[in-house]
């Protein structure tokens, strides 16, 4: 079964710990068709408690803060760890930077934006970074399918 990586913060939960109903609905649809792995900034005990308290079940695993090394970005490390475990078919997050990082690794990404969630822990980079990554991926795919002009025989 294909694996989907879904972020807890911003997709299922607000910064104060309230569930995001639209995100929970999205998760339930995704969980029917994918092996769903949740990523979290909290410990596995706190994450598991929050999920049980909000009746969210059916996930395969939780990647929490123990996958973090000093000097690394936690979500980047979680994406890399998930890729080391097998093919990741879908990545869902509320942060454009992390979606751009997943795109750069070749993972289809879905950015979930909900007005109930506003990230205040760190400022979000401009949309131009995401646009430039999408354009870079498009050009790489074109080059892979068509080849460069030096390789073509016409």
Q: Can you annotate each of these PLM segments?
A:
Residues 120-154:
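C-terminal accessory extensions appended to soluble enzyme cores
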Residues 1-73, 145-154:
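Alpha-helical substrate-recognition element adjacent to the catalytic core
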Residues 53-56, 109-111, 128-130:
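Short, hinge-like loop/turn segments at secondary-structure boundaries
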Residues 49, 81, 100:
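Surface-exposed charge patches
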Residues 72-77, 127-130:
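Short coil-to-beta transitions that initiate beta-strands within beta-rich domains
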Residues 29, 82-83, 102:
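Structural motif
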Residues 86-126:
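Acidic, Mg2+-coordinating phosphoryl-transfer loop and its flanking beta/alpha structural elements
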Residues 77-86:
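Short, well-structured alpha-helical segments in soluble
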